[in-house]
C-alpha cells in the first residue's frame, strides 16, 4: 500500500512541477532575504524550501546563483526565482514526509556507503517497517551509476530516510529524483 501512496504523491509532485515557472516569479516578488540558521522556514507554501531562506543556501548565493552574492533588488529577485526552480516544490515534499518513530525496523538491501560526491557507485533499497504491526511505512531506493569520469545517473525514489537528518529533524521528505546529468565527484 505504501508504494501506491508514493506513486499517487509522486504524480501530484510531478503535476506541481508544472506550476513552478508560474509560481516562482510571483512568490519571489513577495519574499525578501532572511537570516540563515532560522530553521524551519515557512515561506512559499509548497514551493518554498523548509531548510533554507528564500535567497537560497549560502553556497548557492556565493557560487551558483545567476548573480553571486546578490540578495536584494532585481538581481536578488532573479536569484530567488532561480532558487525555487532549482529546488522545486520542497514544501510539498516536507508536507508529505515520513515522520520519524523509534519503533521502526530498518531492512537494507545493497550497499549503504554509496555517494555521488565521494565517487562511490552502487545502490541500496531500504524499507522501514512498524515494529508492532510489521507494516511497511516507508521505502527509499538510491542509486549512483557513473557513465563517465565526471557524470553519473543519480536516482532517489521514496522518502529520503537513510540519512542522519531523518532522526535529527524528525521527518524524511518525499523524493522522486532521476538525474541523468549529475556531477560525479566533488566539483
PLM region descriptions:
Residues 2-39:
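A transmembrane-helix-recognition feature enriched in membrane-embedded lipid enzymes
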Residues 24-105:
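N-terminal topogenic membrane-targeting module
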Residues 35, 42, 46, 57, ...:
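Intrinsically disordered, low-complexity segments enriched in small/polar residues
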Residues 41, 48, 52, 63, ...:
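Intrinsically disordered, low-complexity, compositionally biased regions/tails
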Residues 72, 82-159:
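Acidic, low-complexity, intrinsically disordered interaction modules
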Residues 138-187:
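Charge-dense, extended regions
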Amino acid at each position: 500500500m505504501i508504494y501506491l501512496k508514493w506513486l499517487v504523491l509522486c504524480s501530484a509532485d510531478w503535476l506541481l512541477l508544472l506550476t513552478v515557472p508560474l509560481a516562482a516569479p510571483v512568490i519571489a516578488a513577495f519574499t525578501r532575504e532572511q537570516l540563515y540558521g532560522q530553521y524551519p522556514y515557512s515561506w512559499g507554501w509548497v514551493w518554498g524550501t523548509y531548510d533554507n531562506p528564500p535567497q537560497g543556501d549560502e553556497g548557492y548565493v556565493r557560487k551558483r546563483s545567476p548573480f553571486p552574492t546578490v540578495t536584494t533588488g532585481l538581481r536578488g529577485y532573479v536569484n530567488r526565482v532561480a532558487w525555487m526552480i532549482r529546488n522545486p516544490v520542497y514544501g510539498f515534499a516536507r508536507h508529505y514526509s515520513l515522520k520519524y518513530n523509534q519503533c521502526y525496523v530498518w531492512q537494507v538491501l545493497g550497499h549503504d556507503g554509496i555517494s555521488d560526491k565521494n565517487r562511490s557507485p552502487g545502490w541500496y533499497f531500504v524499507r522501514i517497517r512498524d515494529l508492532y504491526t510489521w507494516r511497511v511505512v516507508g521505502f527509499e531506493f538510491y542509486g549512483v551509476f557513473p557513465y563517465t569520469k565526471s557524470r553519473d545517473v543519480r536516482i532517489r525514489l521514496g522518502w529520503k530516510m537513510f540519512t542522519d537528518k531523518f532522526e535529527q529533524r524528525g521527518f524524511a521528505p518525499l523524493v522522486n529524483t532521476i538525474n541523468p546529468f549529475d556531477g560525479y565527484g566533488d566539483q
